Amino acid sequence: MAHFGVVVGLMMILVFLVFLSSIHKVEEGHLAVYYRGGALLGGPGDPGYHIMFPFITYFRSVQTTLQTDEVKNVPCGTSGGVMIYFDRIEVVNMLTPSAVYDVVRNYTADYDKTLIFNKIHHELNQFCSSHTLQEVYIELFDQIDENLKLSLQMELNVMAPGLTIQAVRVTKPKIPEAIRRNFELMESEKTKLLIAEQRQKVVEKEAETERKKAVIEAEKVAQVAKIQYRQKVMEKETEKFISEIEDSAYLAREKAKADAEYYTAQKSADANKLKLTPQYLELIKYQAVSANNKIYFGSNIPTMFFDSSSRSRIEGKSA
């Protein structure tokens, strides 16, 4: 009876262990694909706890969020025969949940080795074999990232729709030490040349700035002189205009004065012409004689009061 209790206890422990081994957890951002006897079962499992047949069924967790795959120490031979090594290449990619089953079925759960790692090796070797070391190491190095991303994505669109490449980052390749020193020396000389060119450009820019400042100052002086000249011309024109106005006013006044004097004289002459009749002249003569206090002697005194006709008659009688 005691042995039976021990056996029952062992059986319960075994059942408990089997139950524990059948429970598994899928993390958030992952999907679980199940295999039974090496065959892929349909329908990936969502994040959370799941139960499966122990020892018969097993699962693989597949990430469906952004992940970074690293490809290390990739050899690459240039067109000149120089062997270089890319120490690390990072590929940021993401697999959509709807494409997990098809990608795993076609390329296994380690799809990144087939679709990314091998493709990186292939594309880099093709790139290096068609370019010189100078182009790979310096001139075209900034284009390697984008070229790898585009070529990877183009092939994945055909082979594994749903797997997208977000970015590719390539480190500077390792080259033979002697060549590296030559490149560094060349870059140093190039940097010195660029510095000299930039310094020359700065000097030229300063000279150009000074020239422009001188031109601006000269234009400013010329404009000021022109404004002053115009101001003087306007002042002279204003003075001339004022003088003409004053002259016109003076001439008008003088003309009016002369016209008035002429009119007065003319009217006075007309008045005198009307007033100086023979009778009036006789009256004036008598008044003048009567007002004269001088005494005259001679035979002609009586005749002074007669006119010329009377005088001629008197002289005729005397004769």
UniProtKB/Swiss-Prot annotation:
Recorded GO CC terms: endoplasmic reticulum membrane
- Source superkingdom: Eukaryota
Q: Does the keyword Transmembrane apply?
A: yes
Q: Which residues are glycosylated?
A: 106
Q: Which residues lie on this side of the membrane: Lumenal?
A: 24-319
| All ranges on the Cytoplasmic side of the membrane | 1-6
Q: How does it sit in the membrane?
A: Single-pass type II membrane protein
Q: Could you tell me which Pfam families the record lists for this protein?
A: Band_7 (PF01145)
Signal sequence span per UniProt? none
Span-the-membrane segments of this chain are: 7-23
Q: Which GO terms describe its molecular function?
A: lipid binding; ubiquitin protein ligase binding
The entry's localization annotation reads: Endoplasmic reticulum membrane
GO biological process terms on file? cholesterol metabolic process
Which keywords accompany this UniProt record?
A: Cholesterol metabolism, Endoplasmic reticulum, Glycoprotein, Lipid metabolism, Lipid-binding, Membrane, Signal-anchor, Steroid metabolism, Sterol metabolism, Transmembrane, Transmembrane helix
What the protein does comes down to:
Mediates the endoplasmic reticulum-associated degradation (ERAD) of inositol 1,4,5-trisphosphate receptors (IP3Rs). Involved in regulation of cellular cholesterol homeostasis by regulation the SREBP signaling pathway. Binds cholesterol and may promote ER retention of the SCAP-SREBF complex.
Its family?
Answer: Belongs to the band 7/mec-2 family.
Protein known as:
Erlin-1
**Organism name:** Xenopus tropicalis (Western clawed frog)
Q: State the encoding gene.
A: erlin1
